[in-house]
Amino acid sequence: TVGFFGGSITQGSLATAPEKCYAYRVFSWWRENFPNTEINYVNGGIGGTSSLYGVSRAVTDILMYQPDFITIDFSVNDKADEFFQETYEGLIRKMLTWPSRPALLLLNNVCYDTGINAQKYHNEVGRWYHLPSISIKDTVYKKMKAGELKREEITPDGLHPNDFGHALVAAEIIKYLDSVKAHMWEDEEEATLPAAITENAYERAKRLTIREICPVLDGFRADPQEKTSHLDFFKNGWIGRKP
């Protein structure tokens, strides 16, 4: 099982079809390169969410599918500060200690208008746990700043890639996967999980829904409506009676 976890870019915002987003393109690489293996695709991207919410929903939205490989990207929704470094580390530790022991790849997308992302803080966590990372800021964005690409070719709003932009992001990930595949038979020692580099207050965070708790309600009601589409994310919660 190949999983992707992040915000709106991972979700596939502004791609013309779900199959055009970077995540599905990378999933297609797995299927093409390992044709004799049944490979499942899980996309846990939710627009506008950070690793703070991500660490609380990781079990139900991706880990319960027992993934073998996860690409993680909260680099444009997390602020570049120590708070989100801590929530991000909690997410990484939760994934690394999951029974399926997934391999993790850190992805850092970027705001194309400003060059801002959280990769400095995220990559400090990645280096501590010896995890590989892909920087769109240091590749696609760098080419754009050098005049090799135009912003309008990549993204209409300065943040979310169009189909071509998603293809560029996928190409950077696939380039790395090709290099790993070329050396896949080499032995590697399994790393021991080190102590956390932050206070790590969020590793055990859990999202509570109407399935787990029955709070006293004042002005709200439970929402038992079933999910109606793949973009219908926020279910089993509560709805306000007034706007």
Where are these regions (language model features)?
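Active-site segments of SGNH/GDSL-like serine hydrolases
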Residues: 73-77, 86-124
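Sec-exported extracytoplasmic/periplasmic mature domains
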Residues: 31-32, 59, 63, 93-101, ...
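Accessory beta->alpha helical hairpin/"wing" motif in late/C-terminal subdomains of nucleic-acid enzymes
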Residues: 161-162
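Alpha-helical scaffolding within the catalytic cores
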Residues: 1, 24-27, 51-64, 85-94, ...
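Cell-envelope and extracellular/periplasmic
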Residues: 8-9, 13, 34, 43-59, ...
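Conserved catalytic region of serine esterases and O-acyltransferases that act on ester linkages
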Residues: 167-243
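Serine-esterase "nucleophile elbow" of acetyl-processing enzymes
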Residues: 1-44, 57-66, 234-237, 243
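Extracellular serine-dependent O-acyl
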Residues: 103-108, 116-154, 167-181, 186
